[in-house]
């Protein structure tokens, strides 16, 4: 381990956020090495949602509706996250592993998707050497690449978090999962800055180098994270007499009090925070005339706000604060952020736009940690992996709907002649206003849960 890492380990829980997630069973240095799988996932998310979103729309001139659909394709696997987690719970392996084989499969899918993606995007854009190539070829190859990346990301993250909870003591599992998401946000910040620097100025050959480099980095990061991490167990080599049924476990989980209501809250809140993902960077480039590097840093700004929100939520929740109330406050914090983003259109002020983006990210961090903690507390010990999968499935599915819907809605509004007189920012403002509406609806839906929780504490 490097001197810097050793110094961080010695700092201790008092100053290092989430250091109290470590234990004798899972030391901090081992926990940080395991979290490298989230670094790989963060790089992939930034590349898809941030960098390639801007490059496809502005540089490659791909319609925003096509971009929105492409970016949402990886999220087709989102509804299966609970099933993926359940399958890794019950996997039978000759080597005595349950998690490692699934993470390895996800890594290969992610690597393969990135291997063909840059060439597919260049053909999709139809410029330069790809001019005159059939449109269907670019669409089909790009769709395949995005699907492979999506399958890899969801598999790696779901099973990786399950492995982290396996290794951590029961009482430390929410802290460990919180640390994993903080690492994800930090990696997104640095990845967005790095990709912006590498792609400024943009040219096709550099795009190929960057995406291919990410493919190689993802493979090695996951191999380092998994090295001697999961202990081998002879019991995992024996096939049970009766195969466990996913449907039975799912019905048991969803029948718990407020489980379905809580998943609805997660979906609505994610719609509120998620639609901005696909239009923040095009909005900055088209309306506020920001460069590729400047708009790519928007992802870092958004993730930075989320990092602060996630850390604050973890600190407060660790002192007994109600996670549902935390989710309510997160949705409430997102409203002024979207108002600032919408106001930046009239003021043509980049700093107001950045401030609004930061506040929206902060609210998203509070909301995500609140709903994640509430979901984990809802599940018994033997269903924590299923609970994580359910949270991830609803969150990622809603994010996919939000991303696709925002791109299509932006294109429809942009094509309406009645809005042409309001300037190029009008379609974006309409989408941001819709997001604010979803957050307000989320707050309304959370209120009955808060009242029932308050009544239960009074008994």
UniProtKB/Swiss-Prot annotation:
Key word Nucleus present: no
Subcellular location: Cell membrane
Sequence intervals crossing the membrane: 31-51, 66-86, 106-126, 136-156, 179-199, 207-227, 260-280, 298-318, 327-347, 350-370, 384-404, 429-449
Keyword Transmembrane helix: yes
Topology versus the membrane: Multi-pass membrane protein
InterPro entries, per the entry: MFS_trans_sf, PucC, PucC-rel
Keyword field: Antenna complex, Cell membrane, Membrane, Transmembrane, Transmembrane helix
GO cellular component: light-harvesting complex; plasma membrane
Function: PucC is required for high-level transcription of the puc operon.
Protein family: Belongs to the PucC family.
Protein name, entry field: Protein PucC
Native source organism of the sequence: Cereibacter sphaeroides (strain ATCC 17023 / DSM 158 / JCM 6121 / CCUG 31486 / LMG 2827 / NBRC 12203 / NCIMB 8253 / ATH 2.4.1.) (Rhodobacter sphaeroides)
């Amino acid at each position: 381990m490097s001197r810097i890492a050793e110094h961080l380990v010695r700092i201790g829980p008092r100053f290092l956020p989430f250091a109290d997630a470590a234990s004798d069973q899972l030391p901090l240095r081992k926990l940080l090495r395991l979290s490298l799988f989230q670094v790989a996932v963060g790089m992939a998310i930034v590349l898809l949602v941030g960098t390639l979103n801007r490059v496809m729309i502005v540089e490659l001139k791909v319609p925003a509706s096509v971009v929105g659909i492409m970016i949402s394709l990886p999220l087709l696997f989102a509804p299966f996250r609970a099933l993926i987690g359940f399958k890794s719970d019950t996997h039978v392996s000759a080597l005595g592993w349950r998690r490692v084989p699934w993470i390895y499969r996800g890594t290969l899918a992610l690597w393969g998707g990135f291997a063909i993606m840059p060439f597919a995007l260049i053909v999709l854009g139809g410029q330069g050497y790809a001019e005159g190539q059939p449109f269907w070829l670019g669409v089909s190859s790009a769709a395949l690449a995005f699907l492979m990346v999506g399958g890899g990301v969801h598999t790696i993250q779901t099973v990786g978090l399950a492995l982290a909870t396996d290794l951590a003591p029961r009482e430390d599992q929410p802290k460990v999962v919180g640390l994993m998401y903080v690492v994800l946000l930090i990696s997104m910040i640095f990845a967005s800055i790095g990709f912006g620097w590498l792609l400024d100025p943009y040219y096709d050959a550099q795009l190929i180098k960057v995406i291919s480099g990410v493919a190689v980095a993802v493979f090695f990061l996951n191999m380092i994270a998994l090295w001697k991490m999961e202990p081998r167990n002879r019991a995992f080599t024996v096939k049970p007499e009766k195969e466990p049924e996913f449907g039975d476990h799912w019905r048991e989980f969803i029948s718990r009090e407020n489980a379905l209501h809580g998943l609805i809250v997660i979906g609505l809140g994610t719609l509120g925070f998620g639609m901005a993902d696909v239009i923040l960077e095009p909005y900055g480039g088209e309306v506020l005339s920001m460069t590729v590097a400047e708009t790519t840093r928007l992802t870092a700004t958004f993730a930075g706000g989320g990092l602060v929100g996630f850390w604050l939520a973890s600190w407060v929740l660790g002192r007994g604060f109600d996670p549902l109330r935390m989710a309510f406050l997160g949705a409430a914090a997102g409203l002024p952020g979207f108002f600032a983003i919408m106001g930046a259109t009239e003021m043509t002020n980049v700093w107001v736009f950045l401030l609004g983006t930061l506040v929206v990210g902060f609210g998203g961090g509070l909301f995500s940690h609140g709903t994640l903690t509430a979901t984990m507390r809802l599940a018994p010990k033997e269903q924590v992996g299923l609970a994580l999968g359910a949270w991830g499935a609803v969150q990622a599915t809603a994010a996919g709907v939000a991303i696709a819907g925002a791109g299509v809605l932006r294109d429809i509004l942009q094509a309406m002649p009645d809005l042409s007189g309001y300037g190029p920012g009008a379609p974006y403002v309409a989408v941001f206003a819709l997001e604010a509406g979803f957050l307000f609806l989320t707050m309304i839906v959370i209120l009955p849960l808060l009242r029932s929780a308050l009544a239960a504490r009074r008994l």
